[in-house]
Regions:
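Feature responds to low-complexity, polar/acidic, surface-exposed segments characteristic
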Residues: 1-16, 20-51, 59-79, 86-127, ...
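Conserved redox-cofactor binding core of oxidoreductases
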Residues: 138
């Protein structure tokens, strides 16, 4: 109905749709139908409108489910929403958001990236509201540097070359970590 309903809980399918859009930049959903048959999950029969989003995100390893099912109609808690968002930025390439204690690792990573400002840990364990997910997505788009993982160096920022200046034969280069918002939508930090 085109309304936001900020206090309403958000489902796993809805978060997958949002993560797809911020990760690909396909905000008009021009290509999402191409991914409807890419699903690895057994419970997609009732996913309807969300099949393409879930298919893309599953194959890009932005969502994981339980290995067999995704449970698209279930609501997400804050930890689950954060895990999906952090995967879009580049985290969990070393599977640190899986297994025992994954919630602590998700919260710790989000805290280091300042995504949890004014959001308490108790808020993360309950159903995530649309408002909370919107705030977390905004912070991830604008402030969290995208990363790549290598076994030798761990997580390293994806670097964009900016402000290349040649003055008096001297080359000055500023390297800035690139956020998902910069990469996908050309957003700039002020």
């Amino acid at each position: 109905d085109d309304s936001f309903k900020p206090q309403q809980s958000i489902t796993r399918a809805e978060v997958a749709a949002i993560v797809y859009r911020i990760y690909t930049g396909d905000v008009k959903d021009a290509y999402v139908k191409n991914y409807e048959t890419y699903n690895k999950f057994a419970d997609m029969a009732g996913a309807g409108w969300a099949k393409g989003y879930i298919g893309y995100c599953a194959n890009a390893e932005l969502i994981v489910g339980d290995g067999t099912n995704f449970y698209p109609a279930q609501t997400v808690n804050g930890y689950q929403a954060l895990a999906m968002i952090l995967r879009a930025v580049g985290y969990d390439q070393n599977d640190e958001f899986k297994g025992s204690g994954w919630e602590i690792r998700v919260a710790s990573t989000a805290q280091q990236l300042t995504l949890l400002k004014n959001i308490g840990a108790t808020s993360l364990s309950g159903n995530a509201s649309r408002e909370m997910v919107a705030e977390l997505l905004f912070r991830a788009l604008v402030y969290a540097p995208m990363v790549q993982y290598t076994s030798a160096f761990g997580y390293q920022p994806v670097v964009s070359l900016t402000n290349v200046n040649i003055y008096d034969g001297t080359v000055k280069v500023d390297l800035n970590g690139q956020t998902l918002g910069m990469a996908t939508f050309g957003l700039k930090q002020s």
